[in-house]
Amino acid sequence: MKIGVLSQFPELYSTRRLVEACESRGHEAWVINPINCYMNINSVKPSIHLEGEEVPMFDAIIPRIHASVTFYGCAVVRQFEMMGVFAANDSISIARSRDKLRALQLLSRKGIGMPVTGFANKPNNIPDLINMVGGAPLVIKLLEGTQGIGVVLAETRKAAESVIEAFLGLKANIMVQEYIKEANGSDIRCFVVGDKVVAAMRRQGPEGDFRSNLHLGGSAEPVKITPQERKSAVAAAKAMGLVVAGVDILRSARGPLVLEVNSAPGIEGIEQATGIKVAEPIVEYIEKVVAARRANHQVIA
């Protein structure tokens, strides 16, 4: 097969591992920067171009769309979909997961456990918003934040009111979440491919920081997840429509709570923490889907 890896960063570990996994299984891998692509949108032969030339027809693409370019990146993925290319994470699923509020609403609709979350637009709603999530301490998150940036722990009601007022004064979209004290600054990252959790690690925030993101200096170790945690992770990915997902879960007194569903989960951290190769299962999944699509096409023909 010819597989395109859509990434702005060919030198990144995640990109290199995906290329390696494709090639080790006998496939041709191309790294394409989606931001440098441009599209010919027509009803006869839609195409994608790069540096004056038409991009070759791929059997499948693996999107690694950075959060800062979600809109354009999703447009490129959608163009590939229009051309009949299988996307391991389609444009709709990526867009769903990137909208943090919409993602939580989808999880809520499916009955998947998550922290109680409030969302408001007016300063006069702040007192009720704080009560909604059980009072302080509570967590305040910028909807546009990534990798732990724009996440604040307000330890008192007064601090919460001040931070929320400041964000709303800046016209920033924020959500307020209950603080899960028993998680003790750690979470579990489940790496989901299809309907399986292929690896899981426990991430612990640095001393004095409740955020467990590895980019912020957190540590990671392999973890054995419970059947309920496994079920929640797969269900959360499915709720977004994602084939490949990093699902972040908190262990709470009332069971697993899904914090976030990531459509382009990092590969380096989880492979190094667990010793499990997660890039290969992605390629194996693609092989099965493309083979089934070809068989179906032959039957129809």
Curated annotation (Swiss-Prot):
Keywords: ATP-binding, Ligase, Magnesium, Manganese, Metal-binding, Nucleotide-binding, Protein biosynthesis
Amino-acid positions noted as binding ATP in the UniProt annotation, renumbered to this chain: K141, E178, Y179, D187, R211, S212, N213
Gene Ontology BP term (one): SOS response
Chain residues that bind Mn(2+) 1: D248, E260
Co-factor(s): Mg(2+); Mn(2+)
Any Pfam family: Rimk_N
InterPro entries to which the protein is assigned, alphabetical: ATP-grasp, ATP-grasp_RimK-type, ATP_grasp_subdomain_1, RimK, Rimk_N, Rp_bS6_RimK/Lys_biosynth_LsyX
Domain annotation ATP-grasp: ranges: 104-287
EC number: 6.3.2.-
Domain of life: Bacteria
Family of this protein: Belongs to the RimK family.
Name assigned to this protein: Probable alpha-L-glutamate ligase 2
Gene: rimK2
